[in-house]
Amino acid sequence: MWLKLFFLLLYFLVLFVLARFFEAIVWYETGIFATQLVDPVALSFKKLKTILECRGLGYSGLPEKKDVRELVEKSGDLMEGELYSALKEEEASESVSSTNFSGEMHFYELVEDTKDGIWLVQVIANDRSPLVGKIHWEKMVKKVSRFGIRTGTFNCSSDPRYCRRRGWVRSTLIMSVPQTSTSKGKVMLKEYSGRKIEVEHIFKWITAHAASRIKTIYNAEHLKEEWNKSDQYWLKIYLFANLDQPPAFFSALSIKFTGRVEFIFVNVENWDNKSYMTDIGIYNMPSYILRTPEGIYRYGNHTGEFISLQAMDSFLRSLQPEVNDLFVLSLVLVNLMAWMDLFITQGATIKRFVVLISTLGTYNSLLIISWLPVLGFLQLPYLDSFYEYSLKLLRYSNTTTLASWVRADWMFYSSHPALFLSTYLGHGLLIDYFEKKRRRNNNNDEVNANNLEWLSSLWDWYTSYLFHPIASFQNFPVESDWDEDPDLFLERLAFPDLWLHPLIPTDYIKNLPMWRFKCLGVQSEEEMSEGSQDTENDSESENTDTLSSEKEVFEDKQSVLHNSPGTASHCDAEACSCANKYCQTSPCERKGRSYGSYNTNEDMEPDWLTWPADMLHCTECVVCLENFENGCLLMGLPCGHVFHQNCIVMWLAGGRHCCPVCRWPSYKKKQPYAQHQPLSNDVPS
């Protein structure tokens, strides 16, 4: 989890640096920044109208370019970033969806029960044509949707009784707005009574009703009274402008943040004395001033603070978030972090997606479970001081320059989702590359596993868990005895013969390690046949001397082993755990035996160097209870125990897919034993 969190933070850092890189490219090519002010005089008439439409100001009665330019200047300063966003939004030809209501309950659930938004609904009476035609309605939907106003169509033929009860006997337009200034209050439905069925007139009617909810100040005395008043609102945003009514985006935000932020419009059109505004620090017109308990904040002086709905919405959300905003943010972060598993996990493709689905389910479940006590905690009484300090911390942190950069980057990447997804994919591929390289350096076999191998191992794990649940999750002790360790005794009880054994494929048997048992100083059959003539020419006296000398050396070794307890304990510790239980004598005591049919020397030591590193040293097969002879074929299991190849193959092929000694599954890997294996030079010759 911490690794994924680190990669996610690294990805956000990459996005931040990439945004600064794009700004540098734009500055190098054009010589301008996104925060640079634009002179409206240099803009065309079409671009000026685009700016007014994005801000929500009507221009139907302004035929001259000069009047349109003055209206843009009165509504606020224009930045290069806002101009670029407005032109890009105008060029986008995406169709905005509109809701078709199926009846009374559907209408009530979406319109009347929605307390923090505006709805524009076209009601079509029975056997009547709609008030607004299809083409004009599509333009209307596109125009109002940029201000967060949702639209829909209610056809009375689907529920005529509800239309009669409402008095909708003719086709009309209905607007739903919150009735009170409290959050989640009642809504009121207003019917359009205008005669002109045009987009601009309908939009003007909508903005007029939305602006009526904003507190408006017309004189300095009223401003002084309002400025010094302390009430329930911790955040107040003032618009000082020479306009008839506030822009539509300002009115839409006042409804969206009902109960959290108070919006106040100060109309300075007919003011003669503006000295009080100078006293409170208002020098320029128009000005967007945020009043907080800590002081005033001038909106529009930092990066990304445009005069638009999206920019001011993200700014206010960061200062006064809802619980739902925090939950959505945590949900996005958790899922972005969970998707990192797709690139961190190595091996088969199916394995990656299985791990991803498992991680997504786990993380989202834990997130929801974690939010339940948080919601319960927030409903406790006497938490006003906690809320106050938390919001104060948010206000301090989110009014910094760094926070403005983060908000600007958020708006940039949200308007370019393809860039966001491509950078996330590129970041993930880099993680996959370095993770694969790191695991290959560690000789990890899972990197090269294919889909079939992984599915086979998954099926083996599932069947092993289904039929032998303890063996699937319990790690066996490395050095222990059944009589001393009760866990191993319980493990043994988990495999009674009365249990059903899983159907496990025997393909893994051919991958088990196999090798020849050899002894030091003993030749193979070919070497024996080649050197037979030389052996026949040896003198009888030399053989007698050699045998007598070897016998003396053997007797000396036996005396040393019996007289030195430290050496004997060392020998027993180095032997395999099965030697004491299943072998008649320990490997050290078995040196006097013959290890091969061709060996007549009693002190020949097995050549342990030919054994795999993770195999336990033993000289007897516990299946047939016979000693290993020189040149015989051996096979080892993942647990480290060694047997005759024929014996263990017959054992496994009979359906007993476990070690005859420790009952470890013969198809399941196990950590190698971290113990010193005796070599030939450890025993004195």
Swiss-Prot record:
- Could you tell me the keywords of this UniProt record? Endoplasmic reticulum, Membrane, Metal-binding, Transferase, Transmembrane, Transmembrane helix, Ubl conjugation pathway, Zinc, Zinc-finger
UniProt-listed Enzyme Commission number(s): 2.3.2.27
Tell me the InterPro entries matching this sequence: RNF103 (IPR042494), Znf_RING (IPR001841), Znf_RING/FYVE/PHD (IPR013083)
Task: Write down any Gene Ontology CC term.
Answer: endoplasmic reticulum
Where does the protein end up? Answer: Endoplasmic reticulum membrane
Subunit structure of this chain's protein: Interacts with DERL1 and VCP.
Q: What does this protein do?
A: Acts as an E2-dependent E3 ubiquitin-protein ligase, probably involved in the ER-associated protein degradation pathway.
What protein am I looking at? E3 ubiquitin-protein ligase RNF103
Does Zinc-finger show up as a keyword for this record? yes
Q: Which reaction equations make up its catalytic activity?
A: S-ubiquitinyl-[E2 ubiquitin-conjugating enzyme]-L-cysteine + [acceptor protein]-L-lysine = [E2 ubiquitin-conjugating enzyme]-L-cysteine + N(6)-ubiquitinyl-[acceptor protein]-L-lysine
Q: Which GO terms describe its molecular function?
A: ubiquitin protein ligase activity; ubiquitin-protein transferase activity; zinc ion binding
Residue numbers spanned by region Disordered: 526-550
What spans are recorded as compositionally biased (Acidic residues)?
526-543
Whether Mitochondrion counts among this entry's keywords is: no
Which residues are listed as membrane-spanning? 6-26, 326-346, 366-386, 411-431
ZnF RING-type span: 621-663
What the entry lists under CDD domains is as follows: RING-H2_RNF103
The protein's topology relative to the membrane is:
Multi-pass membrane protein
One Pfam family recorded for the sequence? zf-RING_2
